Curated annotation (Swiss-Prot):
Protein known as: ATP synthase subunit beta, chloroplastic
Membrane topology annotation: Peripheral membrane protein
SMART domains (alphabetical): AAA
Compartment(s) where it occurs, according to its Swiss-Prot or TrEMBL record: Plastid, Chloroplast thylakoid membrane
First-level EC class: translocase
Matching PROSITE patterns: ATPASE_ALPHA_BETA
Pfam families xrefs: ATP-synt_ab (PF00006), ATP-synt_ab_N (PF02874), ATP-synt_VA_C (PF22919)
Presence of the UniProt keyword Translocase in the record: yes
Length: 498
């Protein structure tokens, strides 16, 4: 591990033996820098511009070398605003790529793309840092066993299970529960797997980043009394940042996650919100560097950039990084090159439905639209596969019958269809679950439901053994035993009212 010259140095003196160049041209966030002959920096090296602007305010801008232009010039992309920079300013070549702090010191803190804390809680120990540019693990290091990553969330584990070390796409509009689902996953991986999480906010709203931080503190995911007990590190490069920062902030978050996997040998959850913004920032940088655009104006290196990020997210013999990536689909066009390139890397999709959220069924995961490559008998076993398929068939039949019910009512259905509808409504409600992180809102204690318990519960509903229980007994409970207990309580309450 190498000390990060951009975040740990006691000033320019730390770079005394480094290459010195000067700014030759400034085009927005792109700088052309001239260096002495024979002293050119490498691609991806971090350059630091230090000096004072026209009103004598200190300037400290870090850039990353993207192109060697010839004539002893390089073209670099700035990681922060270039306001106040002038031609002729001195530029220091740090001789290394951007490096960021890693390890336990990152938990409970918010960082920017450079690994600098931005939460006003003081400096971070930067003795252990890691460069953000690395190659993906070699084939021989990979753990190729197909294993399920149990989340404790019934609808996910049963119908669209996550792969350990896999990549999951999270699709959903505003206000359907993405944030709460993300926080519950962070909470559950810490409790059940002893793992940690890294959240990369890539090109999204600053307000949402702040709301997430506040909600994490409120729900205990971040312990502000003792930060080392927190379960998550946050890395933000929001909408207002230059494209260079938005393009690299995903790599900063990934580097922190890799340390937990490779050195601490933990299971890590890596959230990227939003993977589309990573592509969008790359497109902006590509245009600024003068590359010829490809389809729909995207960068010609789209697949390469996406692949270099996604291939580092994997399981090794030491631990795993399981990634959940929010995917924005521009104009709902799934054939757009950005989401289409993302889909090629995904093992599962979790689709959140506004219709279910409107019914009050949380998590509002759509059981029919969500998919997983893991849902195969040879991976999950015959019992799990059969149960999941029967649940989907029942819900699909209910969906087909809804138009008839809306026009003619339940009474016009056949006896068999009425039974299907009754069981489907129970299944729909049993797919809801009280979350630990939502205790403060709902007043119901959170429930972690193991996969075996989940399968047992749905098998009992499908077998007809619970046909006599009321629908509301299945709503917002953990395992199936709680359903029978709740049904007994409901019956006692109704008897008392009589």
């Amino acid at each position: 591990m190498r000390i990060n010259p951009t975040t740990s140095g006691p000033g320019v003196s730390a770079f005394a033996n480094k290459n010195l160049g000067h700014i030759a041209q400034i085009i927005g966030p792109v700088l052309d820098v001239a260096f002495p002959p024979g002293k050119m920096p490498n691609i991806y090296n971090a350059l630091v511009v230090k000096g004072r602007d026209t009103v004598d305010q200190p300037i400290n801008v870090t850039c990353e070398v993207q192109q060697l232009l010839g004539n002893n010039r390089v073209r670099a992309v700035a990681m922060s605003a270039t306001d106040g920079l002038t031609r002729g300013m001195e530029v220091i070549d740090t001789g290394a790529p951007l490096s960021v702090p890693v390890g336990g010191v990152t938990l409970g803190r918010i960082f920017n793309v450079l690994g600098e804390p931005v939460d006003n809680l003081g400096p971070v120990d930067t003795r252990t840092t890691s460069p953000i540019h690395k190659s993906a693990p070699a084939f021989i290091q990979l753990d190729t066993r197909l294993s399920i990553f149990e989340t404790g969330i019934k609808v996910v584990d049963l119908l669209a299970p996550y792969r350990r070390g896999g990549k999951i796409g999270l699709f959903g509009g505003a206000g359907v529960g993405k944030t709460v689902l993300i926080m519950e996953l962070i909470n559950n991986i810490a409790k059940a797997h002893g793992g940690v999480s890294v959240f990369g906010g890539v090109g999204e709203r600053t307000r949402e980043g702040n709301d997430l931080y506040m909600e994490m503190k409120e729900s205990g995911v971040i312990n502000d009394q003792n930060l080392s007990e927190s379960k998550v590190a946050l890395v933000y490069g929001q909408m207002n940042e230059p494209p260079g920062a938005r393009m690299r902030v995903g790599l900063t978050a990934l580097t922190m996650a890799e340390y937990f996997r490779d050195v601490n040998e933990q299971d890590v959850l890596l959230f990227i919100d939003n993977i589309f913004r990573f592509v969008q920032a790359g497109s902006e940088v590509s245009a600024l560097l003068g590359r010829m655009p490809s389809a729909v104006g995207y960068q010609p290196t789209l697949s390469t950039e996406m692949g270099s990020l996604q291939e580092r997210i994997t399981s090794t013999k030491e631990g795993s990084i399981t990634s959940i990536q929010a995917v924005y689909v521009p104009a709902d066009d799934l054939t757009d090159p950005a989401p289409a390139t993302t889909f090629a890397h995904l093992d599962a999709t979790t689709v959140l439905s506004r219709g279910l959220a409107a019914k009050g069924i949380y998590p509002a995961v759509d059981p029919l639209d969500s998919t997983s490559t893991m849902l195969q008998p040879r991976i999950v076993g015959e019992e799990h596969y059969e149960t999941a398929q029967r649940v989907k068939q029942t819900l699909q039949r209910y969906k087909e019958l809804q138009d008839i019910i809306a026009i003619l009512g339940l009474d016009e259905l056949s006896e068999e269809d009425r039974l299907t509808v009754a069981r489907a409504r129970k299944i729909e409600r049993f797919l809801s679950q009280p979350f630990f992180v939502a205790e403060v809102f709902t007043g119901s204690p959170g429930k972690y439901v193991g996969l075996a318990e989940t399968i047992r519960g749905f098998k009992l509903i499908l077998s007809g053994e619970l046909d006599g229980l009321p629908e509301q007994a299945f709503y917002l409970v953990g395992n199936i035993d709680e359903v029978t207990a709740k049904a007994t309580n409901l019956e006692m309450e109704s008897n008392l009212k009589k």
